[in-house]
Structures are given as structure tokens and as C-alpha cells.
Amino acid sequence: MKSMDKLTTGVAYGTSAGNAGFWALQLLDKVTPSQWAAIGVLGSLVFGLLTYLTNLYFKIKEDRRKAARGE
């Protein structure tokens, strides 16, 4: 049998997850489909920019390594 400590921890985590899920659903109900479309477009632009900046960072790093090796 599990100790009481582990049981109460599981119940607390389950209650917390249920509460978070409830409030997430409440928030989702307040956003209209057109707002979701705008959120999707803006999110795509942000992730595209982050991808570009990450690629730029590693290209600069690669160029510096090549310059240090004399290539």
C-alpha cells in the first residue's frame, strides 16, 4: 500500500491540473475564431523570425570558425 504522503501528493497534483484545465477552457471560450486566426498569424511570424535569427547566429558562428582556421 502506498504511503499517505504519496497519495496526498497525487491528489494535490490532480486537483491542481483539473483546476488549471478548467481555467484554460474558460479562457478559450472567450476568444473568437477570428481572434484565433490573428493569434495564429502572429505566432507564425514570431516563430519564423526566431528561426531566422537562430540560423543567422549559427551561420555567423560557422564563419568565425572558418576564419580562425584560415579557410
From Swiss-Prot:
Write down the InterPro entries for this protein, in alphabetical order. Lysis_S
GO biological process terms held by the UniProt record: symbiont-mediated killing of host cell
The cross-references to Pfam families, in alphabetical order and at most eight, read: Phage_holin_2_1 (PF04971)
| Keyword Mitochondrion (UniProt) | no
Keyword annotations for this protein? Cytolysis, Host cell lysis by virus, Viral release from host cell
GO molecular function terms listed in the Swiss-Prot or TrEMBL record: pore-forming activity
**Among its keywords, does the record have Chloroplast?**
no
Q: Which family does it belong to?
A: Belongs to the lambda phage S protein family.
Spell out the protein name for this chain.
Answer: Prophage lysis protein S homolog EssQ
